[in-house]
């Protein structure tokens, strides 16, 4: 069975909510929309205090080509434009809306009828995706229309759909495949048409046999779409690892990107969002969020409007357990601990993980023993012990030369470290510093 060739680990899966059908969460009383929910330029608000909005009203315009518009997920009145600390831990400008009713924009098709036919050109499909504010739903939140617009000299050969969901605990993509397989496949066809390719792949790890079976059955009418079962190994959902596993091609080091080996990679949730944007005129304003944890009373998958506070999802899943040690935005490998559970759900909010005291406890960090376990598991072939040490000492020139910008921040190194070193924290610090140095250097050219 296929998998990527370098490194990888096998953390406990803990898919506690995989058997729980998607539930629609109640509307929030107030909704908060950070103006930066994607990779790229922040958006610019186009509403002001006192303005009345509906569900699907554009409230912030894209700030450039690599950016994505933001739409209201609620109807009501704009209370203020202020700032909020989001799940990343940074304070960002945001639009605050007081919710009144649930009135939708009339242009949105709210029917459940499956719409397969699309007579739009590739350029028109890409424009609709852009105008709907669709971004990568796997967490990176890269604007989807940008991936469908290859740089000069590059040509796409295939679309690869990431349905791996290798992050422990999270089950949103799994449930989406079980409940919306036909819509996903139409979305894949739309992405293929927009990318001007004739071959599509959907990579699914073999710990989801029900999803593999159902998607294979539904895809039988699309001979140009292949369902690819994959061996379970983390971080198979990484873009470069998925390309390696599915089509046996390796993406070179940055600044090379997947299109340089002919691949356009999109998350399975993105394929569904594309279907809704193109076929239903529905902008991206809601997503599926997993709320889970070993002590959580009712691990669940919620269809959640953007801007909803995470505390509302936690309450819907039974509330914070008494033995809560940490709340993570995302999963245990790549997610970040939250200091405040009132942070809003954004486009990249895939899950809320509540760890108990025992899980949350970190072992005492000790000196590196040079065991090289982190080197053996790194899926990018890096030396994480060295990157972490040099970052801790501020040796930015050294870490840049050691290819720190190739790190995908999967956390495999920290997971396997017997000395409990906070390697991912140091490497993220180093990447931030080196990224700033590179941008400043390029600005002078």
Where are these regions (language model features)?
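Acidic low-complexity segments
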Residues: 85-142, 153, 209
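Ferredoxin-type iron-sulfur electron-transfer modules in oxidoreductases and energy-metabolism complexes
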Residues: 349-365, 375, 379-445
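Short, well-structured beta-strand-loop connectors
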Residues: 48-61, 80
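Conserved hydrophobic positions within beta-strands
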Residues: 76-78
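N-terminal, Lys/Arg-enriched amphipathic/low-complexity engagement segments
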Residues: 1-46
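Hydrophobic alpha-helical positions that pack around
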Residues: 164, 198-310, 316-321, 331
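Gly-rich Lys/Arg/Thr-decorated short loops/hinges at beta-loop-alpha junctions or inter-strand turns
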Residues: 105-106, 136, 159-173, 295
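Histidine-anchored nucleotide/phosphate-binding helix
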Residues: 178-194
């Amino acid at each position: 069975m296929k998998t990527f060739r370098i490194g990888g680990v096998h953390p406990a899966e803990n898919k506690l909510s995989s058997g729980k059908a998607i539930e629609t969460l109640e509307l929030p009383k107030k909704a908060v929309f950070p103006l930066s929910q994607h990779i790229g330029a922040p958006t610019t608000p186009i509403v002001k205090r006192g303005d009345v909005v509906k569900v699907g009203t554009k409230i912030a315009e894209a700030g450039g080509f690599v950016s994505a518009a933001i739409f209201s997920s609620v109807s009501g009145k704009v209370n203020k434009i202020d700032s909020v600390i989001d799940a990343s831990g940074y304070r960002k400008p945001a639009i605050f809306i007081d919710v009144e009713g649930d009135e939708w924009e009339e242009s949105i098709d709210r029917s459940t009828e499956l719409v397969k036919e699309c007579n739009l050109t590739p350029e028109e499909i890409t424009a609709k995706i852009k105008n709907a504010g669709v971004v990568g739903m796997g967490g990176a939140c890269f604007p989807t229309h940008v991936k469908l617009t290859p740089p000069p000299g590059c040509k796409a050969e295939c679309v690869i759909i990431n349905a791996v969901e290798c992050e422990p605990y999270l089950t949103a993509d799994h449930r989406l495949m079980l409940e919306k397989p036909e819509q996903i496949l139409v979305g894949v066809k739309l992405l293929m048409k927009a990318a001007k390719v004739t071959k599509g792949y959907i990579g699914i790890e073999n710990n989801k046999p029900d999803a593999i079976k159902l998607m294979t059955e539904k895809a039988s009418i699309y001979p140009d779409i292949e369902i690819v079962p994959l061996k379970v190994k983390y971080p198979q959902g990484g873009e470069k690892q998925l390309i390696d596993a599915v089509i046996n091609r390796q993406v070179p080091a940055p600044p090379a990107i997947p299109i340089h080996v002919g691949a356009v990679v999109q998350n399975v949730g993105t394929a569904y969002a594309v279907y809704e944007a193109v076929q239903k005129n529905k902008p991206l304003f809601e997503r599926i969020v997993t709320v889970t944890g070993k002590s959580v009373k009712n691990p669940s998958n919620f269809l959640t409007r953007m801007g909803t506070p995470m505390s509302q999802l936690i309450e819907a899943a039974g509330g914070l357990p008494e033995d809560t040690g940490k709340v993570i935005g995302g999963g245990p490998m790549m997610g970040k601990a939250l200091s405040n559970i009132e942070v809003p759900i954004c486009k990249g909010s895939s899950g809320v993980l509540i760890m108990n005291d025992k899980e949350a406890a970190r072992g005492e960090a000790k000196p590196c023993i040079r065991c090289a376990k982190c080197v053996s598991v790194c899926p990018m072939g890096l030396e994480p012990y060295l990157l972490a040490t040099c970052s801790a000492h501020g040796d930015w020139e050294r870490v840049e030369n050691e290819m720190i910008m190739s790190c995908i921040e999967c956390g495999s190194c920290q997971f396997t470290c017997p000395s409990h070193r906070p390697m991912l924290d140091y490497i993220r610090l180093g990447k931030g510093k080196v990224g700033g140095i590179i941008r400043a250097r390029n600005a002078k050219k």
